[in-house]
Design a protein with these regions (language model features):
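A residue-level marker of the well-folded mature domains of exported/periplasmic proteins
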Residues: 1-165
Length: 165
């Protein structure tokens, strides 16, 4: 969300596509989005977040409806599948920032076509490596410094998408 806010120069109209209501990962992402948006009072969430069940077709249908009713500058999606649906609905080079999470090959196609200027990559491999490292420490009787493990994130856009395919 921070990168989206920067791309919008701190102002604009956004909408958010979420996974299933009650999903822990989605709830944490939404909490993070809301915390960041507090720092950007000129960014308005013009429609309530839509539960698209992590589904591409549902996201596409939702965004098609939104685009007929709202002037959107960005659509933030809690996964790349929904970002693909949002990109399909918005069309190539619409100027709408579409952000997704996961780093999937389908989403990479959107970035090669310049449908969206940003995508967030988080990899299961990095999560697994960090988790294994923590587990090994615990098995050795060591104490972890924290209850949270924070992983580095990489922003991907049309300028570097080929590096991540």
């Amino acid at each position: 969300m921070e990168q989206v806010a920067k791309l919008l120069n701190g102002k604009g109209n956004i909408a958010i596509l979420t996974g299933p209501s009650g999903d822990a990962g989605g709830l944490q992402r939404m909490e993070g989005y809301e915390n960041i948006l507090k720092n950007y009072p000129e960014i308005k969430q013009v429609v309530a977040p839509a539960d698209c069940q992590w589904d591409t077709a549902s996201a596409q249908s939702t965004v098609e409806s939104w685009l007929s009713a709202y002037d959107l500058d960005a659509i933030v999606c809690e996964n790349d599948g929904m970002a693909v649906g949002a990109g399909n609905a918005a069309g190539a080079n619409s100027g709408i920032v579409i952000a997704g999470v996961d780093g999937t090959p389908d989403a990479s196609k959107l970035f090669r076509m310049a449908v969206s200027p940003v995508r967030f990559l988080r990899t299961a491999a990095l999560w697994a490596a960090n988790g294994i490292e923590a587990a090994v420490k615990l098995l050795k009787g060591e104490t972890l410094d924290t209850t949270e493990i924070v992983t580095d994130n990489t922003w991907i856009d049309s300028s570097n998408v080929k590096d991540y395919e």
